[in-house]
């Protein structure tokens, strides 16, 4: 068999990619929640480009259009940020049902599959890899143990919020939002501050 290799990979700063300085194992990226097909797609673009200028394509399409004559001699740049962007495209193109299973298995099946399913519409446009999911959604599964802001002086405020929410009969996002906006106006609190406090008390984070 005849073997061919591309030039040495470089970092975005044009320095040589090194296993002593950079994560070069596929297992590292898989552990971050990068899909194998996204990683393969990105690596295919190292030293080669699609004849139609496409960045996203399947392995089957790659096999069909690849020509060894198109390999470039210039040392390609391996950019983890670009890889994450590409993986994000794969996430957004994936059916919610399949993404639910991916997240469920990535989290070692420790969290409710049904609840994961309900949170996907909230984060699908925001995450770029599966490891991004839990930092955004952990508060759905367990009460925060730490809070980034001290809210102990706002107990009366949250009592008023609680009382207002108890009045809501039709528990829908737009109705809840309208009730909270009206309460903020009644209490003469800016929406930005009002909802920041709400975010912190629910998620523990700013």
Name each model-derived stretch:
Residues 1-91, 195-202:
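Alpha-helical recognition segments enriched in aromatics with Gly/Pro capping
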Residues 47, 87-90, 107, 165, ...:
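Short amphipathic alpha-helical interaction patches enriched in hydrophobic/aromatic residues
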Residues 96-190:
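Small-residue-rich helix-loop
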Residues 181-206:
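Conserved glycine-rich FAD pyrophosphate-binding loop
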């Amino acid at each position: 068999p005849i073997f061919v290799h591309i030039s040495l990979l470089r970092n975005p700063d044009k320095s040589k990619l090194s296993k002593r300085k950079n994560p070069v194992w596929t297992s590292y990226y898989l552990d971050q929640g990068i899909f194998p097909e996204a990683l393969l797609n990105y690596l295919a673009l190292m030293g080669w480009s699609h004849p139609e200028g496409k960045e996203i394509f399947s392995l089957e399409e790659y096999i069909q259009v690849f020509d060894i004559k198109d390999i470039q001699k210039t040392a390609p740049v391996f950019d983890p940020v670009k890889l994450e962007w590409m993986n994000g495209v794969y996430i957004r193109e994936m059916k919610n049902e399949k993404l639910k299973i991916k997240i469920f298995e990535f989290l070692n099946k420790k969290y409710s599959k049904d609840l994961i399913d309900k949170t996907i519409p909230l984060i699908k446009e925001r995450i770029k890899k599966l490891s991004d999911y839990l930092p955004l959604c952990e508060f759905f599964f367990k009460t925060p143990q730490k809070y980034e802001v001290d809210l102990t002086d706002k107990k009366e405020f949250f009592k008023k919020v609680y009382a207002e929410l108890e009045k809501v009969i039709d528990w829908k996002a737009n109705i809840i939002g309208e009730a909270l906006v009206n309460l903020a106006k009644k209490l003469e609190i800016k929406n930005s501050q009002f909802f920041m406090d709400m975010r912190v008390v629910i998620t523990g984070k700013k």
